[in-house]
A protein has these predicted regions:
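ATP-dependent carboxylate-amine ligase
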Residues: 1-51, 64, 68, 86-89
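Phosphate-binding loop of NTP-binding sites
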Residues: 3, 23-29, 46, 59-63, ...
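Pocket-edge structural micro-motifs
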Residues: 11, 54, 112
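Short beta->alpha connector loops at strand-helix junctions that form conserved
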Residues: 35, 55-56, 94-95
């Protein structure tokens, strides 16, 4: 995937969104974002270097944004979404960005109604010892204390 410098997340505190933000932070990107409320997840992202605000206000958006990742949990009527759309800044759903990242990697997908996080965590644990991997787990896996595992 092409390197981008400045990525903005709308709904950065969500479990899937925060995993993507952590991935891009580790890759050396500048990460900015909005969420409705602070949480342990957003605090951890801020410790890692993300700039996050909790007020719907376009003045908190940095001057340079290469693209936006959003979750459908944030309505398209949100001031910031409207701003990005009006300024022709590319906006991608979380799932599309996950697809961009994984498109050039061997991939195992886990689907279903119940047990996806547990199953993904088990697969990650098994493969982690012998193979470098990138795993988006879908929840905070206790054995990794993370929702994303990135081996270099």
């Amino acid at each position: 995937m092409k390197h981008f410098d400045n990525i903005y997340f709308m709904g950065i505190g969500g479990i899937g969104m925060s995993a993507l933000a952590r991935y891009f932070l580790q890759a050396g990107n500048h990460i900015y974002g909005y969420d409705l409320t602070p949480s342990d997840i957003t605090a951890h992202l801020e410790e890692l270097g993300a700039t996050i605000h909790y007020v719907e206000n376009v003045e908190f958006i940095p001057e340079q944004v290469d693209f936006v990742v959003y979750t459908p949990a944030v309505p398209k009527t949100h001031q910031e979404y409207v701003y990005f759309e009006k300024n022709n800044i590319p906006i991608y759903k979380r799932s599309a960005v996950l697809g961009m990242i994984s498109s050039h990697l061997p991939t195992i997908g886990v689907a279903g109604t119940h047990g996806k996080t547990t199953t993904t965590s088990m697969i990650t644990t098994i493969l982690h010892d012998d193979h470098p991997l990138l795993a988006f787990i879908g929840g905070i896996a206790k054995n990794f204390n993370a929702n994303v595992v990135i081996d270099d």
